[in-house]
């Protein structure tokens, strides 16, 4: 089983505690995702002008990009309360009914991992989203009866990293659908600088940029790396983070300039050295790495593919010439004739 990685995009308890102090409250402070931000500003202003609950919102994209943060921002901009839960927590229809009946008019209900709702719970959610009503069964057997309960108008925000797992009936009930994209290094630099200022960390623009470029396009990773570099700087550099300090801290953490850690590099190296660069089936690759298939597909591969180091084909996984160069290896002539010489890893 893979231990928690410093560049993992999944949330930890430390992330949750730290995020609470640096989480933006307004759209103006929500950096990056400009198309989403501009659209949401219009939808929010229109709903407030009409005095109505905003339409239901589905937010999807890779983990760590700010889906939960955006839900908090939306509720703050609407001036309403936010109730937060997740799909696995809502086990029974009664659990969902309890949440819905406690909402005030125009409140926002945020359901993380909404793709993990059970079919029974989804059936209760459909009329709640469409008609602001739910049907609850009271009693058992022949004495059972259905009671219709009216709900106040509310906005449901569903978040998921696996939009393809949503059922069509549920997906179709969202009037607003937003995809969050990976952040650019420039956007992440602004996020790191903002977080450093809020946390009272002495960080130069060059130090912030170095942290940002190794953060895999993900704010959660950028903020986590900032905290680890802060630890290093407090012990080794009197609390001051500049470019050399950030680079030295990343060397200690074994996070290279592409944002890869040892597990990323081990996967690329295994494909090159054991499978001649691929293609190799995911099951064989998982066995060679002593990792679960799900870990490869959901945790390791997405960023390698997105950055152009790995290709997923019908015959299996293949590395690209970029992977050879990144590992300091010469690219085989049959794969990319005339390509350059190997580069430095760090």
UniProtKB/Swiss-Prot annotation:
The keyword Endoplasmic reticulum does not apply. It catalyses: ATP + H2O = ADP + phosphate + H(+). One of its GO terms (biological process) is DNA recombination. ATP binds at residues 22-23, 64, 67-69, 130-132, 173, 183, 220. It is found in: Cytoplasm. DNA binds at residues 293, 312, 317. It comes from the Bacteria. It holds the Pfam family RuvB_N. Residues 1-183 are annotated as: Large ATPase domain (RuvB-L). Residues 184-254 are annotated as: Small ATPAse domain (RuvB-S). Its EC number is 3.6.4.-. GO terms for cellular component: cytoplasm; Holliday junction resolvase complex. Has 3 domains, the large (RuvB-L) and small ATPase (RuvB-S) domains and the C-terminal head (RuvB-H) domain. The head domain binds DNA, while the ATPase domains jointly bind ATP, ADP or are empty depending on the state of the subunit in the translocation cycle. During a single DNA translocation step the structure of each domain remains the same, but their relative positions change. Belongs to the RuvB family. This is Holliday junction branch migration complex subunit RuvB.
């Amino acid at each position: 089983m893979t231990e928690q990685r410093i560049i993992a995009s999944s949330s930890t308890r430390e992330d949750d505690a730290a995020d609470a102090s640096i989480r933006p409250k307004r759209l103006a402070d929500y950096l990056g995702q400009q198309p989403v931000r501009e659209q949401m500003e219009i939808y929010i202003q229109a709903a407030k002008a009409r005095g109505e609950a905003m339409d239901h919102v589905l937010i999807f994209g890779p983990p760590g990009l700010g889906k939960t943060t955006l839900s908090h921002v939306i509720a703050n901009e609407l001036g309403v309360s936010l109730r937060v839960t997740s799909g696995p927590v809502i086990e029974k229809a009664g659990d969902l009914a309890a949440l819905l009946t406690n909402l005030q008019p125009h409140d926002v209900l945020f359901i993380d991992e909404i793709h993990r709702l059970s079919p029974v719970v989804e059936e209760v959610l459909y009329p709640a989203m469409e008609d602001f009503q739910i049907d609850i069964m009271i009693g058992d057997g022949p004495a059972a009866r259905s009671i219709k309960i009216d709900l106040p108008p509310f906005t449901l925000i569903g978040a998921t990293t696996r939009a393809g797992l949503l059922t069509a009936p549920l997906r179709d009930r969202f009037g607003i659908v937003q995809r969050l994209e990976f952040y650019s290094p420039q956007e992440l630099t602004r996020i790191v600088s903002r977080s450093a200022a809020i946390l009272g960390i002495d960080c130069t623009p060059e130090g912030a940029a170095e942290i940002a470029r190794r953060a895999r396009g993900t704010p959660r990773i950028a903020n986590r790396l900032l905290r680890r570099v802060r630890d290093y700087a407090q012990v080794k550099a009197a609390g001051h983070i500049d470019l050399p300090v950030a680079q030295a801290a990343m060397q200690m953490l074994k996070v290279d300039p592409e944002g890869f850690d040892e597990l990323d590099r081990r996967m690329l190296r295994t494909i090159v050295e054991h499978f001649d660069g691929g293609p190799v089936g995911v099951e064989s690759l998982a066995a060679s790495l002593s990792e679960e298939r799900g870990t490869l597909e959901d945790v390791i591969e997405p960023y390698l593919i997105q950055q152009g180091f790995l290709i997923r084909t019908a015959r299996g996984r293949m590395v690209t010439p970029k992977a050879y160069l990144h590992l300091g290896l010469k690219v085989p002539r049959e794969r990319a004739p005339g390509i350059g010489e190997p580069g430095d890893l760090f």
